[in-house]
Amino acid sequence: MTNKAHSQGSKKTIQGSMPAIVTPMFEDGSLDYPGLRALLDWHVSEGSDGIVIVGTSGESPTVSVEEHCELIRVTVEQIAGRIPVIAGTGGNSTQEAIELTHFAKKVGADASLQVVPYYNKPTQEGMYAHFKKIAESVDLPVILYNVPGRTVADMAGDTVVRLAGVPGIIGIKDATGSLERGTLLINDLKRAGHHEFSVFSGDDLTAAMLMLMGGHGNISVTANVAPRLMHELCVAAMSDDVKRTREIQYQLIAVHKAMFIEANPIPVKWALHEMGKITAGIRLPLTPLSSSLREPLKAALKQANLL
């Protein structure tokens, strides 16, 4: 596939399987930085093509600004240039997003992930102005993040096409879960001449199909527990190997579904703890996985040969 997003400066290619990594915590809710370092090394060894830190799966709403910055710093330090680091620095305050993005740039992140502002429900023009301001304020590549199931505000395809023309905005994580919307967006971007703008899936169930239709990778929850398989899935789908894509997708489909039997990242953190990869902590208002759902999740992991 020739269309690849690149981070400015380092020119690292941003594509393929990028886990939206969890934030390891001790049972008292304090952050487990040694555990994070070990988890990052595991992802590199298992073939992950990039790391997204402090996103939805990383419990970004419940870490302090100081913790947010330290998570980015530790991740960049531990990865040490081996794969791209995409820092979740978005929010519903434009100025705060700019400040966090400045920090990410300073410590060496390769790009930023900027969520559609939530709660304050901006108009399409407000979204455009918000993302444009961030891109103009910090010399760090911006990946847009549309996840209307969480933000309520939903960025229209026309707005994405407009933003694709803003220097520094290099792609979007489309977490609408709509294959129709994703493929139409890819087509609209091509028709508008934005051939270097990347569309990443943010929905594991539909990611394989979106990549077969021209998507450039997957910012994934499932990749937290199956990094090698998700890397192989992205390679297969992006090289039009339909047979191998289908094989891996069916191996993982129960896991894709199980990752959302309760609100993300509750199931994925429980799964990683069960796999021996992280400590057991999670922060309120999120709570540990309901006991009645543990066996079904364990069964999905076993079905995919992850346990």
From Swiss-Prot:
Q: Which GO terms describe its molecular function?
A: 4-hydroxy-tetrahydrodipicolinate synthase activity
**Subcellular location as annotated:** Cytoplasm
Catalytic activity reads:
L-aspartate 4-semialdehyde + pyruvate = (2S,4S)-4-hydroxy-2,3,4,5-tetrahydrodipicolinate + H2O + H(+)
Q: Tell me its EC number(s), please.
A: 4.3.3.7
The residues that the entry says bind pyruvate are: 57, 219
Sorted keywords for this record are: Amino-acid biosynthesis, Cytoplasm, Diaminopimelate biosynthesis, Lyase, Lysine biosynthesis, Schiff base
Q: Extract the CDD domains matched here.
A: DHDPS (cd00950)
Q: In which pathway does it act?
A: Amino-acid biosynthesis; L-lysine biosynthesis via DAP pathway; (S)-tetrahydrodipicolinate from L-aspartate: step 3/4
Q: Which Pfam families match?
A: DHDPS (PF00701)
The site feature described as Part of a proton relay during catalysis is recorded at 56, 119
Concerning InterPro entries, the annotation shows: Aldolase_TIM, DapA, DapA-like, Schiff_base-form_aldolases_AS
| Domain of life assignment | Bacteria
Q: Report quaternary structure and partners.
A: Homotetramer; dimer of dimers.
Q: Which PANTHER family match?
A: 4-HYDROXY-2-OXOGLUTARATE ALDOLASE, MITOCHONDRIAL, DIHYDRODIPICOLINATE SYNTHASE
Provide the family line.
Belongs to the DapA family.
Q: What does this protein do?
A: Catalyzes the condensation of (S)-aspartate-beta-semialdehyde [(S)-ASA] and pyruvate to 4-hydroxy-tetrahydrodipicolinate (HTPA).
Designated name of the protein: 4-hydroxy-tetrahydrodipicolinate synthase
Per the UniProt record, the source organism is Polynucleobacter asymbioticus (strain DSM 18221 / CIP 109841 / QLW-P1DMWA-1) (Polynucleobacter necessarius subsp. asymbioticus)
